[in-house]
Amino acid sequence: MPRVALQMSFRPDRPNRSTTIHWSFAVSRPESLRTLLLRLPPGMGFANSSLGIEECAPAVLEAAGPEGCPADSRLGHGSAVAQVPAQSLVSERAQVTALLGPSAGGDGETMNVLFFVEGRSPVNREIVLDGQLSGIGAAGGATLMTEAPPLPVWPAGPDIGLVRFRSTIGPEGLTYYRRVGGRRVAFEPRGLSVPRRCPRGGFPVSLTLGWWAVSGTVTARGRVACPRG
């Protein structure tokens, strides 16, 4: 089975204050990703977040990229590395943009999250991954679930295998806009808030990955360090 390593941090990391979640994972060997389930720490605050004021339609994202979507739909950004099977493994680097997708319902506990993955060399490809951030406010913590299709290098060819992925969820590097007195004014949105209390050893997090060609799943567990002071 592939080995998976998970890392997560809050920046800044003050209790009950807006933060940006930085999360990343690495896989020991290239495999075609099928499912991703990220569990956030219990107690993350969503009530005061202003992330995702507007929605981005998947059809618009596929046709025009993130630039075709409202700036106020962006949730985060990052990068990915995949490996392309050839005579030897060839690394493919890609940019990642996370955006708010169409509403998943009126319960207020689920958000659709779209990941736009843009690779340029050696394979020129753009992929939209559809995910759901659910269980917002749940005692056990919210979860981010994403599914990915097989990604062959060419028709009937071998699949691209994801080996590294990192992304943010939060205001770091984001600029939103609003109308004030008829003028368009830029502002930084509020992110999710760091839990008020930190358990001994840090906030528990986990990541479960599944692959198309591998039976079963692998779960990586970690801890986010408690805020200082």
Residue ranges and their predicted role:
Residues 1-229:
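Ser/Thr/Pro/Gly-rich, low-complexity intrinsically disordered stalk/linker tracts of secreted
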